[in-house]
Amino acid sequence: MSIALKQVFNKDKTFRPKRKFEPGTQRFELHKRAQASLNSGVDLRAAVQLPNGEDQNDWVAVHVVDFFNRINLIYGTICEFCTERTCPVMSGGPKYEYRWQDDLKYKKPTALPAPQYMNLLMDWIEVQINNEDIFPTCVGVPFPKNFLQICKKILCRLFRVFVHVYIHHFDRVIVMGAEAHVNTCYKHFYYFVTEMNLIDRKELEPLKEMTTRMCH
């Protein structure tokens, strides 16, 4: 990453503290292997494939946390331009509106300004990945039976961040010179969720044309 990009993607812009893996754990080793593959310039399609002999849940857990960190950082770079005035509803253009629902305050799908939606989303994901019952960090502790379903929901909601950034704020990304970095992150995300079958195709529709050009 260039010096300019490092200034754009600095830790002060991050929405949340990064979640890290404990050194010495299996997931830490998988994370290192995944990062090494990316840094070596290997084909992203190949980089997301489950390594032989590795557990699918571990592989998914590593990537979910990594994508949360990366997408959180991307949104953090443009969040000052994403306001209740500029983005009164969380959307992806005129055809797609995303409503927030959780088990706490918003029991029914509710239209919210994009920055409020993003805050709730990042808070919600942070709770999931810091929950030892869902993302266990101790060796030998099994993942819950509904682990992949939870990850699908996390990744589906993270995809909506890409949709909003690309459709409503990509001009800022270009001004900051971060276009290539964001595109690479998106391609990595897209190849992973399609390789592991973690997002329904209909959810990917808002960026279908761009994805066809970018991820051919």
Swiss-Prot record:
Protein name in the entry: MOB kinase activator 3B
GO biological process: regulation of hippo signaling
InterPro entries: MOB_kinase_act_fam, MOB_kinase_act_sf
Ligand binding (Zn(2+)): 82, 87, 164, 169
Molecular function, one GO term: metal ion binding
UniProt keyword list: Metal-binding, Zinc
Role description: Modulates LATS1 expression in the Hippo signaling pathway which plays a pivotal role in organ size control and tumor suppression by restricting proliferation and promoting apoptosis.
Pfam families, alphabetized: Mob1_phocein
Gene3D superfamilies in UniProt: MOB kinase activator
